[in-house]
Each structure stands twice: as structure tokens, then as C-alpha cells.
Swiss-Prot record:
Protein name: Glucose-1-phosphate adenylyltransferase
Similarity comment text for this entry: Belongs to the bacterial/plant glucose-1-phosphate adenylyltransferase family.
Enzyme Commission number, as recorded: 2.7.7.27
ATP-binding keyword on record: yes
Organism lineage string: Bacteria, Bacillati, Bacillota, Bacilli, Bacillales
GO molecular function annotation: ATP binding; glucose-1-phosphate adenylyltransferase activity
Amino acid sequence: MKKKCIAMLLAGGQGSRLRSLTKNIAKPAVPFGGKYRIIDFTLSNCTNSGIDTVGVLTQYQPLLLHSYIGIGSAWDLDRRNGGVTVLPPYSASSGVKWYEGTANAIYQNMNYIEQYDPDYVLVLSGDHIYKMDYQQMLDYHIAKQADATISVIEVPWEEASRFGIMNTNENMEIVEFAEKPANPKSNLASMGIYIFNWPLLREYLQIDNADPHSSHDFGKDVIPRLLRENKRLVAYPFKGYWKDVGTVKS
């Protein structure tokens, strides 16, 4: 069943900086405002953006998250063709093989993506609080004829070293990207939301997987490699409210 764009939602985070809040549950399952959990924001965004096929990649303490997501009916994602699918790490040979990084998590689930033969893959994080129309970002990605588009937000300078930081030219093309730099040159931060042309992403996940020196992370490995090889990466400026639930304070 061909899909124009599917989403892969990274919900495996242990959230060790959140201390006792996440002792027994994955960070995206942390309760927010009583009856919601943090992952609700991203799943609702998918539904409201017309993205009806979402793979949720879980690994740390996944049971609560699995039962919470269920078949996705809370977000109108209980579809016969697509819908929401929980994708825990599986091992072909022995024991459980943990996802080794954000890029490795997607790499291990390329078969899931292939069955939809998408033109584009939207990569999301399940531990952010924000409202966003991903369809607008996809339209922007297509209009810019980009290989990859990264959603960005201006953060306070004193917080910039917590994020992937990029410099862009006047056309919003990314010319430089540094993951958590000690001395940031810009305060334009990656929101951990990416759109890739699937054929390109597939190729670069395979290259990354074969690299013994890679930590298999989008921010540390895949994005810098795409830049080095002069792929067209553009930044999509987001103006709304966004919080990365990385620390108890936020």
C-alpha cells in the first residue's frame, strides 16, 4: 500500500535526566496535565497533519507505552492500511538487541517502511511538547527541493549547547551543523523533527550502519555526513511553542 509520507516516532528514551519521574516508564509515557502523556502531542500532530501511518519505536520500559498506545484509536489511528504500529527492538539471532542510536532504530525497521514505499519519511521524537502541522513542513520540503529538512527553533543562547545547532544561509540552506557544541555559533536549534526523501535516507542508513566508527545517531553522524557530501539540507523555522522535556525544570 503506497503512502506519500509515513512517520517514524522515536519513543525509546530513558530520560535519565528526569530522575524519579521516569524510573519505571519511558520518557514519552510520562504523564502531562492529568490524563495525557507526553507522546500524545506528537501522535495528535500526526492525525491533525493527515499522517495516518506511524511507526512508534520503543525500547526502554515499553510496556506502559505499548498498552497506552494500543491500536491507536485515541488518535483516530486505528486504520486498516497503516495506522499506528509499535516497533520494539527485535533480534534476528539471540536475545534482545537494543537500538544503538536514533539512526540505528530506523535502520532496524527499514522493512516496516518499505511495505509502504513512501516518497518521504518524517522522523519524530516522542518527548516534546508542541503543536505542529507536519503537512506544512512537507510542503516546504518539496518546494525547496530538499534532500532533508530539519525543523528548527530559536532557543535562548544559554541553552544552545543542549541542542544540535545549525547555521543557515539566506535561503535557509544548512551550511553547518554541530551536535551540542560547547561554544555555539548560532541559537538555531534542531527540534529533532526531520523529513527525508526515503531513497536518500535508505541509502545513508545503510552507509551509516556499515561504519564501525559511527554512533548511529542522526545529529552526530547522519546529518553531518549528508552535509559533508553536499546534500541539500534546509531548515524549517518553527514559530510556535515547543518544549524538549529533557530536564525536570522544563
